[in-house]
A protein has these predicted regions:
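Asp-based phosphoryl-transfer active-site loop
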Residues: 4-18
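Active-site phosphate-binding/coordination module
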Residues: 23-123
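Short active-site oxyanion
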Residues: 36-40, 64, 152, 212-213, ...
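Short, structured coil segments at secondary-structure junctions
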Residues: 62, 70, 173-175, 229-230, ...
Length: 268
């Protein structure tokens, strides 16, 4: 059965180490689209952080979709219509804010419009995230966050500090929230059962596609959920070694246009 939907992660997958889309990847995506294959960007980034990529890849046509915030938001790219929109409650935010202070890690909350931190000394990885996704940073106290629609929170810090903090996260937190590590310095916390996998499953059902007709390409732990729900999971050569254990295929690295290799080898 032919593959009709490809979900593609961005960082470490779609773009190379210079955060660029290679000509080979661009051409392969255009050829897949011309063949009637849905190419869906699936990322932890907010929508503002993928707008330029959607334009560059010409994925703004009627019937094109994008998955952002690690699955909390699914939209039609032509008009912004929301298919899925999940958010955290204010109580969830307070829960996470309190835990971050207890663990001694920086935290920020992300809405559809900006990045909010209650840390007066804004962490460098919050600044990094702001630059990466083209969103402004706002300092707000926890009390000032009550009226914000928070899509996800992130614990962000030096890798060794974050890893030590992760070991101390209470078990019940994993029962109440969806928690994924998207980079060595990022831990993402979302509403329970929200991840790239749930988003891709919903989208495939909406499009009437079977599991065998779906493919996902990723490199990091926050891609695990979507790799687990598709019939054709592909992991990048530069991907997490643990993730490769669940892959059907291993493609070339992101610096070798691995997405293009996957599309041309197993789709077209």
């Amino acid at each position: 059965m032919s593959i009709k939907l490809i979900a593609v992660d961005i960082d470490g997958t779609l773009v190379n180490s210079k955060k660029e889309i290679t000509p080979e990847v661009f051409a392969a995506i255009q050829d897949a689209k011309a063949a009637g294959v849905k190419v869906v960007i699936a990322t932890g980034r907010p929508i503002a952080g993928v707008a330029r990529l959607l334009d560059d890849l010409q994925l703004r046509d009627e019937g094109d979709y994008v998955v952002t915030f690690n699955g909390a938001l699914v939209q039609e790219t032509a008009n912004g219509h929301e298919i899925i929109s999940e958010s955290l409650t204010y109580e969830d935010y307070l829960d996470m804010e309190f835990l971050s202070r207890k663990l001694g890690v920086h935290m920020h909350a992300i809405t559809k419009d900006g990045i909010y931190t209650a840390n007066r000394n804004i962490g460098k990885y919050t600044v990094h995230e702001s630059t990466l996704v083209s969103m402004p940073i706002f300092y707000r106290t926890p009390e000032e966050m009550a009226d914000k629609e928070i899509v996800k929170c992130m614990f962000i810090d030096e890798p060794e500090i974050l890893d030590a903090a992760i070991e101390k996260i209470p078990a019940d937190f994993y029962e109440r929230y969806s928690i994924n590590k998207s980079a060595s310095f990022y831990l993402e916390l979302l509403k329970k059962d929200v991840d790239k996998g749930s988003a891709i499953t919903h989208l495939a059902e909406k499009l009437g596609l079977s599991k065998d007709e779906t493919m996902a390409i990723g490199d990091e732990e926050n891609d695990r959920a979507m790799l687990a729900v598709v019939g054709n999971p592909v992991v990048m050569e530069n991907g997490n070694p643990e993730l490769k254990k669940i892959a059907k295929y291993i493609t070339k690295s992101n610096d070798e246009s691995g997405v293009a290799h996957a599309i041309r080898t197993w789709v077209l």
